């Protein structure tokens, strides 16, 4: 797993309190990992802080899964 994926997974596990093995590429933050809309906003803010990037609102709405987050951050970094 890439450094970006490892760091994203750590953030997801810490913020959502889920088991690390539940965080798969296709895992939906809401449907599979139990996040609500506030959780997803907090995740985006944590990603921005961790990676020193800005995620515009329209882009944030497209980040629905762990894989989406890794792909977006990898391309933005």
From Swiss-Prot:
- Species source reads Ruegeria sp. (strain TM1040) (Silicibacter sp.)
Question: In which compartments does the protein localize?
Answer: Cytoplasm
Pathway entry: Lipid metabolism; fatty acid biosynthesis
Carrying O-(pantetheine 4'-phosphoryl)serine, the residues are 37
Protein name as annotated: Acyl carrier protein
InterPro entries xref list = ACP, ACP-like_sf, PKS_PP-bd, PP-bd_ACP, Ppantetheine_attach_site
Q: Which GO terms describe its biological process?
A: lipid A biosynthetic process
Describe the function of this protein: Carrier of the growing fatty acid chain in fatty acid biosynthesis.
| Annotated GO CC locations | cytosol; membrane
What post-translational events are described?
4'-phosphopantetheine is transferred from CoA to a specific serine of apo-ACP by AcpS. This modification is essential for activity because fatty acids are bound in thioester linkage to the sulfhydryl of the prosthetic group.
Name the family the entry cites: Belongs to the acyl carrier protein (ACP) family.
Q: Which UniProt keywords apply?
A: Cytoplasm, Fatty acid biosynthesis, Fatty acid metabolism, Lipid biosynthesis, Lipid metabolism, Phosphopantetheine, Phosphoprotein
Q: Where is the Carrier domain?
A: 2-77
Q: Which residues cross the membrane?
A: none
